[in-house]
Design a protein with these regions (language model features):
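Glycine-/charge-enriched secondary-structure boundary and capping motifs
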Residues: 2-13, 121-139, 152-159, 210-214, ...
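N-terminal amphipathic/basic leader segments beginning at the initiator methionine
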Residues: 2-39
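A generic structural signal for residues located within well-ordered alpha-helices
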Residues: 16, 20, 86, 195, ...
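Residue-level signature of catalytic and energy-coupling elements of molecular machines
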Residues: 17, 68, 181, 254, ...
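Buried hydrophobic packing segments
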Residues: 24, 28, 50, 94-95, ...
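Glycine-rich phosphate/pyrophosphate-binding loop regions near the starts of catalytic domains
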Residues: 27-190
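Short, acidic (Asp/Glu-rich) active-site segment that either coordinates a divalent metal cofactor
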Residues: 67, 158, 171-221, 225
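Short loop/turn motifs at secondary-structure junctions
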Residues: 102-104, 199, 248, 333
Length: 351
């Protein structure tokens, strides 16, 4: 059987534009340059990103890694044709995870899969990644943009990445040091962050590009549902690092998919439980809107969304005021939402 094609084939004819890839790299270089720090040993473009480890003063340096994406939040970015903040979400989801063990982010790498490489769009996305890196103190030392013609529609893309941080072994946050009477502090979120978008898409008709997405809502301070949902995930790294210098932090939870019920227990040891005062939680208006439009039960809301709390931190009762002062001085809306009690059956109770 003759498999030869009468027409000559090329990578471009197959849908992969190498020249566009080169242009995208050139356009993103200015964004990457913003993230350079003392650990960077080379420029973007090599086969591997080299980074010198800042281990001075550490007895047992430990590397901590985390990887994540933005979920289906990218669907809304695509619909709105707004791509300059979704990269912040990708970074936030990773660095907020590794700070939960006390690790200072060192560097970040991103991965973009797209149906068609449009250099200007890719540069916008990477610009957001760079902004997230600046906010967290991480260097953007590399990445990959993969063009997938035939696998993804031309306008679609997905974004993910991973972060690597460092912490001295003796300073790794150890939940086993937690005790009855410790206090749970909330750090306010900027909104839905990057989780629960599949439910949002159903409730608000995002996949059908519901016109109501673009109507200003009084309950959202005059903003539209679309722009409120696309608000970038808050990055807590620098605030938490400042806290760790002065306060005995015993546990941190990044409130992501699964909400309070799945994330708070991850930082609570056996035999103890975080008792959360629901009335103390400053629920953001967007969550009330999701609940009312979708008729979503309260339990499901707290089991899906952050509800206005992007991170919870456990500290000793006698250090609460110091912790709040430090966090507020670093721009956080921080407040007490609960305490640690003895309980052999549950690790979080909301009442």
């Amino acid at each position: 059987m003759d498999h030869k094609n009468s027409q000559s084939a090329s990578y471009a004819a197959a849908g992969v534009d190498i020249v566009a890839g080169y242009r995208a790299v050139e356009l993103m270089k200015k964004h990457v340059a913003r993230t350079r720090n003392d650990g960077c040993l080379d420029d973007v473009g090599g086969f591997g990103g080299c980074f010198g480890l800042p281990v001075a003063g550490m007895e047992q340096p430990v590397l901590v890694s985390g990887t994540d994406g933005c979920g289906t939040k990218v669907k809304l970015a695509i619909l709105m044709d707004k791509h300059d903040t979704i990269g912040i979400d990708a970074v936030a989801m990773c660095v907020n995870d590794i700070i939960c063990v006390g690790a200072k982010p060192l560097f970040f790498l991103d991965y973009i899969a797209c149906g068609k490489n449009i250099p200007e769009k890719i540069a916008e996305i990477v610009g957001g990644v760079a902004e997230g890196c600046v906010q967290s103190g991480a260097a953007l030392i590399g990445g990959e943009t993969a063009e997938h013609p035939g696998l993804m529609p031309a306008e679609d893309y997905d974004l993910a990445g991973f972060a690597v941080g460092i912490v001295d072994k003796k300073k790794i946050i150890n939940k086993d040091r937690m005790s009855e009477g410790d206090v749970v502090i909330a750090l306010a979120s900027t909104g839905i962050h990057s989780n629960g978008f599949s439910l949002c898409r159903k409730v608000f008709g995002i996949d059908n590009n519901n016109p109501e997405l673009y109507i200003p809502q009084d309950s959202l301070g005059g903003k539209t549902i679309a722009e409120t949902l696309l608000t970038p995930t808050k990055i807590y790294v620098k605030s938490v690092l400042a806290l760790l210098e002065k306060v005995d932090v015993k546990g941190i939870s990044h409130i992501t998919g699964g909400g309070f019920y799945e994330n708070i227990p991850r930082s609570i040891p056996d035999g103890l439980c975080a008792k959360i005062d629901k009335a103390a939680v400053k629920v953001l208006p967007i969550f009330d809107l999701i609940a009312s439009w979708g008729n979503v039960p309260e339990r499901d809301m707290f089991n899906t969304y952050n509800m206005g709390v992007g991170m919870s931190i456990v500290v000793p009762a006698d250090q609460v005021e110091t912790a709040l002062d430090i966090l507020k001085a670093n721009g956080e809306d921080a407040y007490v939402i609960g305490s640690i009690i003895k309980n052999d059956e549950e690790k979080v109770i909301l009442e």
